[in-house]
Design a protein with these regions (language model features):
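Surface-exposed, low-hydrophobicity beta-strand/loop segments enriched in small/polar/acidic residues
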Residues: 1-169
């Protein structure tokens, strides 16, 4: 028996946030390029704004599909949490009131994505990356294999990388 995931066909990569829920939380969307996205609620309770290309995580102890760009909201103090996806749009969380306002966004969960590399790091094609701090990724170290967000497929040795996402669906 074949199993297929229900998904939304997107005409292009999403690049904006919604202040009203347009899809079911957790819905998958895909573009004709093969990139896949998941519809989530933005956690507006913290002080870390969302920006395209920044990793996001399921809020520790939060509601299903509520995500944050704040590493401390990911359930640890420092690295050690698996990414839920990559933000596709900017959200100024200070413009919203927690408990009153809701914001929704597609996050990228599969395909190739542009991310920001932590300064001073040299990542070459084929090497895996993990979240380093709010908004940047870093070269995966020994013992962090389970945290890999994907591997570099372009932009080696620069501050901007293209990675092939993995393990986020």
């Amino acid at each position: 028996m074949a199993y297929t995931f229900p998904s939304v066909e997107l005409s292009s990569a999403p690049d904006s946030a919604d202040t009203s829920k347009k899809y079911e939380l957790g819905a998958l969307g895909r573009t004709e390029t093969g990139n896949m996205y998941r519809y989530v609620q933005v956690d507006v309770s913290d002080g870390v704004d969302w920006a395209a290309g920044h990793p996001v995580y399921i809020v520790y102890g939060g509601d299903s599909y509520e995500c944050s760009a704040d590493l401390s909201d990911a359930g640890t103090s420092g690295t050690g949490t698996n990414a839920a996806g990559i933000a596709t749009a900017t959200v100024d969380v200070s413009a919203y009131t927690d408990g009153t306002d809701t914001v929704y966004q597609w996050i990228q969960v599969a395909g190739s994505a542009s991310v920001t590399l932590h300064s001073g790091t040299d990542v070459t094609n084929g090497l895996h990356v993990v979240w380093h701090d709010d908004g940047t990724v870093d070269l995966m170290a020994a013992g962090e294999e389970h945290l890999s967000m994907g591997y570099c497929i372009g932009g080696s040795g620069t501050t901007s990388l293209t990675i092939q996402l993995q393990g986020m669906l």
